[in-house]
């Protein structure tokens, strides 16, 4: 939910969100109520781009780099084009990105998308600056409530005929969080059980409760059709 009392630090096309978690979102398309077909949600860091945006050292370098210097993981840009275009190559299937990267590096990320010809319908950034301002330092690296909240905000708007395909990596917890999201959408994980699951993963209690409250606004259905995870960790946990 946007708070109109917040200062307008972001350009008009970006939505400042404070609940269920601080984030900044840009939506460029609303799907018609009768839409029936696939939609795709992608992570960015280590799923599309070979970067570490979510780590402090990586984030600090981004504003000083050129978008052309950022490297996509092999094959991912072609895959994004194919998913977007569909079999007819002109379907413009819905494509969204959710990233724990902070909004201040959005220009570098979106410029890279422009260079690579990647059309997208929405992108959500974790508002790390607001989290820091709130002195919730443990939430800077803990992404559970952010990612579930961002996903549920999208799910609430998807038409009933949407079939969701999700792409992430194992550098963090994408597989687990995507599975939790699938269970939330299907009605298998709601209420106090959802709050406890988030807190056990490190989410703050008040964020966990806000995510659980948002989940009640999402109609129960089997929304998620497939989850694809890029394996970047070694068996011993190394990267």
Predicted features along the sequence, with ranges:
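A metal-dependent, Asp-based hydrolase signature
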Residues: 51-54, 61-63, 67-73, 97-118
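A solvent-exposed, charged loop/short amphipathic helix patch at secondary-structure junctions
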Residues: 50-70, 185-203
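Non-catalytic pre-domain segments flanking phosphatase-related domains
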Residues: 1-42
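C-terminal cap/substrate-recognition subdomain and adjoining C-terminal extension
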Residues: 101-239
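Asp-based phosphoryl-transfer active-site loop
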Residues: 38-51, 178
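Short, acidic loop-to-helix structural element flanking the phosphoryl-transfer center
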Residues: 65-93, 103-107, 145
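Short, surface-exposed connector motifs at secondary-structure boundaries
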Residues: 86-96, 158-163
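Structural recognition of the beta-strand scaffold that forms the well-ordered cores
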Residues: 42, 96-97, 165-166
């Amino acid at each position: 939910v946007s708070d109109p009392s917040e200062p307008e630090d972001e350009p008009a096309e970006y939505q400042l969100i404070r609940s269920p978690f601080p984030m900044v979102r840009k939506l460029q398309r609303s799907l018609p109520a009768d839409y029936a077909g696939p939609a795709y949600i992608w992570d960015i860091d280590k799923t599309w781009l070979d970067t570490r945006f979510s780590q402090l050292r990586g984030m600090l370098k981004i504003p000083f780099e050129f978008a052309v210097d950022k490297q996509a993981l092999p094959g991912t840009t072609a895959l994004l084009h194919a998913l977007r275009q569909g079999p007819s190559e002109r379907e413009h299937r819905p494509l969204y990105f959710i990233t724990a990267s902070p909004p201040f590096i959005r220009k570098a990320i979106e410029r890279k998308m422009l260079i690579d010809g990647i059309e997208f319908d929405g992108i959500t950034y974790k508002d790390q600056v607001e989290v820091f301002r709130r002195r919730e330092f443990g939430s800077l690296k803990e992404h559970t409530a952010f990612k579930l909240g961002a996903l549920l905000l999208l799910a609430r708007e998807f038409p009933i005929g949407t079939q969701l395909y999700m792409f992430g990596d194992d550098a963090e917890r994408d597989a687990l969080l995507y599975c939790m999201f699938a269970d939330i959408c299907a009605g298998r994980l709601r209420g106090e059980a959802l709050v406890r699951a988030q807190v056990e993963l490190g989410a703050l209690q008040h964020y966990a409760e806000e995510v659980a409250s948002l989940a009640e606004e999402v109609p129960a259905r089997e929304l998620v059709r497939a989850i694809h995870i890029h394996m970047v960790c070694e068996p011993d946990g190394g990267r």
